[in-house]
Design a protein with these regions (language model features):
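Conserved catalytic-core motifs of GNAT/GCN5-like acyltransferases
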Residues: 130-134, 144, 149-167
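Helix-turn-helix
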Residues: 139
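Active-site acidic-Proline motif in GNAT/NAT acetyltransferases
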Residues: 101-103, 107, 135
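Acetyl-CoA-dependent GNAT
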Residues: 7-97, 101, 114-116, 120, ...
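Conserved GNAT acetyl-CoA-binding A-motif
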Residues: 114, 121-134
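Actinobacteria-biased recognition of intrinsically disordered, low-complexity terminal regions
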Residues: 1-5
Length: 178
């Protein structure tokens, strides 16, 4: 049996150029290792930076919350709690881009990062978290095992390539459920 996973969770760290570069590096490496994170492998820094730019702007403006995990001082994973910007849904956010660097995957760090993000969400007064996963990856079983439930599916909503359309699976977790 594996011992406890030690991951230092940081909420809203200063998003300077060095940290941005680190986060983009993790994103590119995780995508190229098979991660379903909004890009299609093979990808590069330029593609990730273009997709990340609006996120960085929203984090810096205080609309969204960056959560990252450090192990022995090194950033090994990150995610964003994205605000809906809707006055009818201030009680929940969407969890976006949960990722752990491929060279430390399989050590429980993804679970630890998710638990840390959920703790941040609770401290923000949120009562639920929503996320989406790409169909055909098996990722939904990871989240189901951690208390998330499928609440909807958009058939063929994600086009990875001609002839390769995947479902976008929506999942939900009531944060009061433990």
């Amino acid at each position: 049996m594996r011992g406890p996973v030690h991951l230092q969770i940081e909420h809203q760290p200063v998003l300077d150029a060095a940290l941005r570069a680190e986060l983009i590096g993790i994103w590119v490496d995780a995508t190229n290792a098979g991660g379903a994170l909004g890009l299609v492998a093979p990808t590069n820094r330029q593609a990730a930076e273009a997709l990340a730019a609006p996120t960085w702007t929203r984090v810096e403006a205080g609309h969204d919350d960056l959560v990252l995990g450090r192990r022995d001082g090194r950033v090994v994973g990150w995610c964003v709690l994205e605000s809906r910007g809707n006055p009818l849904s201030p009680h929940w956010r969407s969890l976006k881009r949960l990722q752990v660097h491929p060279d430390v995957q399989g050590q429980g760090l993804g679970r630890a990062l998710l638990a840390g993000a959920e703790d941040v969400a609770r401290r923000l007064g949120l009562t639920a978290v929503h996320l989406t996963v790409r169909g055909g990856t098996g990722t939904e079983s990871f989240y189901t095992g951690l208390g998330y439930r499928e609440v909807g599916r958009l058939p063929g909503a994600l086009r990875l390539a001609d002839g390769d359309d995947r479902d976008e699976i929506h999942m939900w977790r009531d944060l009061g459920a433990g």
